Amino acid sequence: MQPLLSVNDLSIGFGKNPPIVERLNFTVHAGETLALVGESGSGKTLSCRSILRILPSTAQIRSGQILLNNRGNSLDLAKLSERQLRDVRGDRVTMIFQEPMSSLSPLHRIGDQVSEVLKLHRDCSQSIAKRQVLKEFEYVGFNDPERTYNAYPFELSGGMQQRAMIAMATVAKPELLIADEPTTALDMTTQAQVLGLLKKLQAESGMALILITHDLGVVANMADQVVVMNRGRVMESGASELVLGSPAHPYTKKLFKAVPVISDSIQPALRQDTADIILSLRDVSKTYAIRQGNALSPNYSIQAVNAVDLDVPRGKVVAIVGESGSGKSTCARIALGAESSDHPGQVFFKESPGTDAIEVQSLDPSRRADFQRKAQMVFQDPHSSLSPRMQIIDTLTEPLDIHNIGTLAERRDRAIELLEQVGLNPSMLRRYPHAFSGGQRQRLSIARALALRPQLLVCDEPTSALDVSVQAQVLDLLEDIRDRLQLSYLFISHDLAVVARIADEVAVMRRGRIVEQAPPEVLLANPKHPYTQALIAAHPKPDIHRPIDLDTVALGAGEPDTWPDAFRYTVGNAPPLKEIDTNHLVRTHA
């Protein structure tokens, strides 16, 4: 059978430089899923953008063919005019981009943006287009299609924005859908639901799917064929059973080795030593007042955090796990004193064993500055947390300058020491952030957090923006400096596999409350709460024989008033956290 799409000897370059993508070959048949796998910079996105000829202005297709089956004849997309391409883009071949918020116009309603596809390619009226769009919205899982049609992008969550992008890409019933990292920015349960939706759409429409991803777990759940890329070249390709089951190339093996996994084995939990607690949150809550845009509408409030109690033992890693909006980052900011807790919440910090704990919320400015030297934060996105206008030496010495620590020579020596601590060369001091890779920038963020010799690091999703192998390197670094410098971590994440590797204790949050808490070897092997079970079930494993359990995900990912009776609650009647076993707490009525 003739393939729907054939890419033959494709090479892409910028200007007169050597090619970025070199001699790429793959085919996709109708109804088939091909996964392009690789780390950032491997050329997978550039390759797929070339199919639709939406490359950057300085990039050129140097050689090769991109053949689309046109009723038995081959149409070379690389040679079509711009006018001819308009009949292909958005109609026969469509694309879902990685960041839905940057792909959707903030100035236009969702429904109008999706309707535009039908007006361009089906020449239909506004009323017919709206009817078809509402039907598509219902199909992709919107509970209220009419409301979604009239909404602006900022009014939708990340998962809902991605569903809107899927609706836009599929409303014209394309033959080929290209999905560029469609779940990278999403939480685990939302990711599982989006992957399930793509499989459903594909099964019912027969469209082909090219999936661009760096996640081998996603590949195992979706792909029929796999192409592994590195630095613009194909390292390995073949059926997913072969590539995932017995990878042959060293690079593919390296990717597999770096994948964090959740163990199935249950180990008995030991009673934690609670004598030396460096950080303690007691009855911490946070309510935000939301102003309505319409002056006639009443304001309302959102409780982001609700009565959280949490201890971080000295020298240990305590992780808070949950989806976006669960309250975990708000807890982190309150722990550092960047936000205040609602009354009567308190945050206690003990500088050393045997000393009295200080209450962070009530510190005066001078004592707060002293506390901030001892508790620092590593942020999620190293790109936005490092000033593009400052050389690295200035970035690393700025905290020392603010706190009037050391002479200029001593600060420079400290900057060199910090680079060496995080595995970077001191010769990089005069570079700017843009000269570093994502993993190197995160190392720089960690180095800056260490500048004041803190005792506590709050790490807010420090690996979520990184490729899997770079993620493993950053986790290695965090473990190394924890042991060498005797640090304590409050670690924020949505990825249970990452947490399983680094944490001594895990607290799972949902809608502002801790619903389950235990050491990772207990929590991940023997979860009791339906939400914890959903998070674990939603984690894609790089094993084609262990697909995502969408039923378990749907059960636990719902609202608290839809959970099983033992765990169900509404706003005012949440059950308490109960110790059901040694160091294993569950919020349950039972």
Question: How would you describe each model-predicted region?
Answer:
Residues 2-3, 74, 143-150, 240-301, ...:
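Short catalytic/signature loops enriched in Gly
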Residues 151-156, 160, 432-436, 440:
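Conserved ABC ATPase signature
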Residues 65-87, 125, 196, 346-370, ...:
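ABC ATPase NBD Q-loop/coupling interface
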Residues 171-175, 451-455:
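A short, proline-enriched helix->beta-strand linker immediately N-terminal to the Walker B motif
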Residues 128-147, 352-355, 410-427:
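Conserved ABC ATPase "signature" region
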Residues 234-238, 246, 514-518:
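ABC ATPase "signature
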Residues 114, 166-167, 190, 194, ...:
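Hydrophobic anchor residue at the start of the ABC signature
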